Amino acid sequence: LWAQWYIGLMVPPLMLALLTQEKALDVSPEHFHAEFHETGRVACFWVDVCEDKNATPHSPQQRMETLISQALVPVVQALEATGEINGKLIWSNTGYLINWYLTEMKQLLGEATVESLRHALFFEKTLTNGEDNPLWRTVVLRDGLLVRRTCCQRYRLPDVQQCGDCTLK
């Protein structure tokens, strides 16, 4: 759950900044600082606000790809290197989170932008720079809805039940 707490706290505000502001926020890891809760999970972040002059002229898709490659890939690689969690599970949960937040942002961004981002993020095997897209097929179309492709595994934790939309049902 640590990875879900960390990424779940970090991604929505970064998406909001990257997709709604004229100037792109530099999302390089050195600009992020975290404070931890007594339980060990991240309690809050603060960010050194700096413009990424290279990303400022980018499209929403390219800005999201910057979020993936600069902010998320290093975190997922570090967590996977511990040997405690599989990176594919982290990406699966991250895809689900991003898809949910795109729905929340639909009024701000417009339906066309949200659908374009969903297509690029979840249905393209590679990013525009040619790298593998770690979010590819983390959510899939089922019965007309985008849903998580694989179980998040939360049900394995003590005192935690299956999610309402668990793929194991």
Where are these regions (language model features)?
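Hydrophobic, aromatic-lined core segments that form the binding pocket/scaffold
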Residues: L1-R142
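Local cysteine-cluster metal-coordination motifs and their immediate loop/turn environment
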Residues: R149-K169
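Active-site-proximal "nucleotidyltransferase
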Residues: L135-L145, T150-R156
